[in-house]
């Protein structure tokens, strides 16, 4: 798919299709008015006849409109003009792309990026249009023998911007949008892989593949023998029940020789049966998505490398599998973590934190500027925030605010939960330094409280993506989140700010 920006009048476009908006009730957008004028009222007469009301997502495809050079005109319902917000804008773009892809229009000029979206500028509208387009056209069909493909799919999309001085902004928005979209695709492809393919070794191979693709990325992989030498006994305990060896991939991106690195740590449970504390059979197939954190770190590192940002970032993919084998760890076991702290296992299905605690201890050797871990950690986060919002907890207020700001900019929302000392009391154990669960109340917070005991030497944030990493039902599959949030955070850290864009 090829993207570009231009600035011009709709009536002068020679294209397979021109896309313009119509507001409710039957009100032409300024661009649609220009086409109506050149066609001697042809479009407005159709609206008066009741062919299109302008409700959000309504579509009307016109052929051979008088006076218009393009073969087709696609009228897109945008709802009430004053109520057009970012969520509705993305829904409209998605519906538009689906329609274009099915009409045989292999190229189109889209004027929807000229619509006024509350609180958003041209950069945001173009970038979101690119990201939404790529996400909408995504299809994971690698294991299907009969692949359904459009006969004449959309190949080229041009976004129109109001003035020529905004062309540079639009080009930057496309570059950023394509990088984020590629990162999202990498994340979704890896996460959607079946667990008989995507095991810890496969996850590590994808990290090596990334290093082969970019000169400023290197990857090393730590196996179980080296983990044992490092004292990563908590991580290794989770892996004991599986025939698949645990592997931790460390991806290093160097864009600034002098800066301390930002470290991203992704939970990579390529399949989580729950172990001895086994999960119910219903829905267990979706536990292949328990490596969504690692997949999102991999995708973010790809986006970062494509953007060539002048910062240093280390991505850690903590690959592992939690299975109920004869050598599996048990409820009641006491583990000595890499940090030296001891952990009483009360539930083997609270395994992600046992993997992450050793990974978070390991990354201290890089003297990090900031550490962010990403994990499908707790079902409690779904109860608290549902499937729309990622949970955020942090030991450093400025970092939390940075991430919240990036989440709003990227349209990949997060919400902060508290991390008060009182929650630590729920982790007390009579036999070890801590238990690996704190009971049902505040499950997301106590999981983060557990991790906070291993992150005292640096600024740290935790993203719980249990509710946002994948969808169930008819739209089942990885969402690619929070790649947009993390990439935006890195763009901001690299100094690519709003002033530069404007």
Swiss-Prot record:
Transmembrane segments: none
Keywords annotated in UniProt: Aminopeptidase, Cytoplasm, Hydrolase, Manganese, Metal-binding, Protease
UniProt KW Transmembrane keyword: no
Gene Ontology biological process terms from the UniProt entry: proteolysis
InterPro entries to which the protein is assigned, alphabetical: Leucine_aapep/pepB (IPR011356), Macro_dom-like (IPR043472), Peptidase_M17_C (IPR000819), Peptidase_M17_leu_NH2_pept (IPR023042), Peptidase_M17_N (IPR008283)
GO molecular function: manganese ion binding; metalloaminopeptidase activity
Binding site for Mn(2+) 2: 267, 272, 290, 351
Cofactor: binding comment: Binds 2 manganese ions per subunit.
Main location: cytoplasm
Active site residues according to the UniProt entry: 279, 353
Subcellular location, record wording: Cytoplasm
Domain of life: Bacteria
Enzyme class: hydrolase
Enzyme Commission identifier(s): 3.4.11.1, 3.4.11.10
Role this protein plays: Presumably involved in the processing and regular turnover of intracellular proteins. Catalyzes the removal of unsubstituted N-terminal amino acids from various peptides.
Protein name: Probable cytosol aminopeptidase
């Amino acid at each position: 798919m090829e993207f570009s920006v231009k600035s011009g009048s709709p009536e002068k476009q020679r294209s397979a299709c021109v896309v313009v908006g119509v507001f409710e009730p039957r009100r032409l957008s300024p661009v649609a008015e220009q086409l109506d004028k050149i066609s001697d009222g042809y479009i407005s007469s159709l609206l008066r006849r009741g062919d299109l009301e302008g409700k959000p997502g309504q579509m009307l495809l016109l052929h051979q409109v008088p006076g218009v050079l393009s073969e087709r005109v696609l009228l897109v319902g945008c709802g009430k003009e004053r109520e057009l917000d970012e969520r509705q804008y993305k829904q409209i773009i998605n519906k538009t792309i689906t329609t274009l892809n099915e009409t045989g229009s292999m190229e189109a000029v889209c004027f929807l990026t000229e619509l006024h979206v509350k609180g958003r500028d041209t950069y945001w509208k173009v970038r979101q249009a690119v990201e939404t387009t790529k996400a909408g056209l995504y299809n994971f069909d690698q294991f299907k023998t009969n692949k359904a493909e459009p006969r004449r799919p959309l190949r080229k999309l041009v976004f129109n911007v109001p003035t020529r001085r905004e062309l540079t902004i639009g080009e930057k928005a496309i570059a950023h949008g394509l990088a984020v979209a590629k990162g999202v695709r990498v994340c979704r492809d890896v996460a959607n892989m079946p667990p008989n393919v995507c095991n810890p070794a496969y996850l590590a191979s994808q990290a090596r593949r990334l290093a082969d693709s970019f000169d400023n990325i290197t990857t090393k992989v730590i196996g179980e023998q080296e983990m044992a030498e490092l004292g990563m006994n908590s991580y290794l305990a989770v892996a004991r029940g599986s025939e698949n060896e645990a592997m931790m991939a460390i991806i290093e991106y160097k864009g600034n020789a002098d800066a301390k690195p930002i470290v991203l740590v992704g939970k990579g449970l390529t399949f989580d049966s729950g172990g001895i504390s086994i999960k119910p059979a219903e829905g267990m197939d979706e536990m292949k998505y328990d490596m969504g954190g690692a997949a999102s770190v991999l995708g973010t590192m790809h986006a970062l490398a494509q953007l060539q940002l002048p910062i240093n970032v280390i991505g850690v993919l903590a690959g592992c599998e939690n299975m109920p084998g004869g050598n599996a760890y048990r409820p009641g076991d006491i583990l000595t973590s890499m940090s030296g702290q001891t952990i009483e296992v009360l539930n083997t299905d609270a395994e992600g934190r046992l993997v992450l605690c050793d990974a978070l201890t390991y990354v201290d050797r890089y003297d990090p500027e900031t550490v962010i871990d990403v994990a499908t950690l707790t079902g409690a986060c779904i109860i608290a925030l549902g499937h729309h919002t990622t949970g955020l907890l942090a030991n450093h207020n400025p970092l939390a605010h940075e991430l919240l700001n990036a989440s709003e900019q990227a349209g990949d929302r997060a919400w902060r939960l508290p991390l008060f000392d009182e929650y630590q009391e729920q982790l007390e154990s009579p036999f070890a330094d801590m238990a690996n669960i704190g009971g049902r109340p505040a499950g997301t917070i106590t999981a983060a409280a557990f991790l906070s005991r291993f992150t005292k030497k640096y600024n740290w944030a935790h993203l719980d993506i249990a509710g946002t990493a994948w969808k169930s039902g008819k739209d089942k599959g990885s969402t690619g989140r929070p790649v947009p949030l993390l990439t935006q955070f890195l763009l901001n850290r690299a100094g690519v700010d709003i002033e530069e864009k404007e």
